[in-house]
Amino acid sequence: MIRGKIDILVVDDDVSHCTILQALLRGWGYNVALAYSGHDALAQVREKVFDLVLCDVRMAEMDGIATLKEIKALNPAIPILIMTAFSSVETAVEALKAGALDYLIKPLDFDRLQETLEKALAHTRETGAELPSASAAQFGMIGSSPAMQHLLNEIAMVAPSDATVLIHGDSGTGKELVARALHACSARSDKPLVTLNCAALNESLLESELFGHEKGAFTGADKRREGRFVEADGGTLFLDEIGDISPLMQVRLLRAIQEREVQRVGSNQTISVDVWLIAATHRDLAEEVSAGRFRQDLYYRLNVVAIEMPSLRQRREDIPLLADHFLRRFAERNRKAVKGFTPQAMDLLIHYDWPGNIRELENAIERAVVLLTGEYISERELPLAIAATPIKAENSAEIQPLVDVEKEVILAALEKTGGNKTEAARQLGITRKTLLAKLSR
């Protein structure tokens, strides 16, 4: 690493100490940013990629250990050095356990500081943990679960290549976020990232969007238009819901991928294009191939590198971090002083199955913030389907029959709606007839 290209974030609520460190580190050739609180540090880490964080332990609002853990959740690869005026073994051990690379005793020995900085940055290079050109947190990819770490590792491995990527996952799992992270971490990051949802357009419109059209090619084509392939030339083209395209479009897309050239609608001229293609789908394309609905040759072209998106229920340990992330965003947007969640509300969020995944969680938190009149989000502000989630003791050896679980949810919904069966059924997403049938079992 060239020092002039290394960005260091100093986190300390002592303004004078921050200023001294900034002058010192800049004198050594580093770029330095300052944060006077843990919350300020997190905001900066979300917006910018830092090569190293130097963080004080004792801070008023959010201490250094808590800040360290939150930063690691946002970007596990970033090296963090802890500063403490208290040379207790307990503090050092706690910091190292939380993910700190090393710790420094205040007042700082500047020679020791310089040596520790150089070792930390060298360690980053040696372990191959050179930070990508953009932090995962910038794209909303938040979490420290094994599933999330596996996904981030896949992104780091795949991004340097030009191999076509197929991202598979349920709706709301963040497939476009992964595509954006792949592009940002690739050698094409300074070139365009062009996105298109294939399911949102009919066949003729999709053809025009992908390949462009000549003036007069069809009714309404009053001028020549370049397609998404040409717009993405030199960069990345992300095609979402690729499993929804028609057989004719499958043929045209296959040709574009194989030949690396496209033709505008209404033209015989071919245009060479250089794009990194990333596709995504919620469908099982192997199953679609077996059923004759998707071309096998196109499937093999797309599925060079496969990335499987974990559902939110497969990484429940990330829910508190995600919920807090959305809470801060919507609290700021709505100008509300929200402090957090009640323990009961967080339990409900963790135990709910999230069929709509991260998108559903985001919507639920936005709704809760809008409805909130106090300082903490409780079960009252959560959507009924979540508030009615039964929470069983984790150590319970007995598996409760599904019919009993359904009845518990329905009874909770009825209690919340004052016994109104029609409203309870509506909020649970079932018909009144189904609700009555399940109650009578």
Swiss-Prot record:
Tell me the Gene3D superfamilies matching this sequence.
1.10.8.60, 3.40.50.2300, Homeodomain-like (1.10.10.60), P-loop containing nucleotide triphosphate hydrolases (3.40.50.300)
Keywords in alphabetical order, please: Activator, ATP-binding, Cytoplasm, DNA-binding, Nucleotide-binding, Phosphoprotein, Stress response, Transcription, Transcription regulation, Two-component regulatory system
Positions carrying 4-aspartylphosphate are 56
Q: Which InterPro entries match?
A: AAA+_ATPase, CheY-like_superfamily, Homeodomain-like_sf, HTH_Fis, P-loop_NTPase, Sig_transdc_resp-reg_receiver, Sigma_54_int, Sigma_54_int_dom_ATP-bd_1
Which SMART domains does the record associate with it? Answer: AAA, REC
Modification note:
Phosphorylated by ZraS.
Tell me the ranges covered by the Response regulatory domain, including all copies. 7-121
Q: Is Hydrolase one of the keywords UniProt gives this record? A: no
Determine the domain of life of the protein's source: Bacteria
Q: How is its activity regulated?
A: Activity of the ZraS/ZraR two-component system is repressed by the zinc-bound form of ZraP, which probably interacts with the periplasmic region of ZraS.
Q: Name one GO molecular function term.
A: ATP binding
Function per UniProt: Part of the Zra signaling pathway, an envelope stress response (ESR) system composed of the periplasmic accessory protein ZraP, the histidine kinase ZraS and the transcriptional regulator ZraR. The ZraPSR system contributes to antibiotic resistance and is important for membrane integrity in the presence of membrane-targeting biocides. ZraR is a member of the two-component regulatory system ZraS/ZraR. When activated by ZraS, acts in conjunction with sigma-54 to regulate the expression of zraP in the presence of high Zn(2+) or Pb(2+) concentrations.
Name of the protein described by the UniProt record:
Transcriptional regulatory protein ZraR
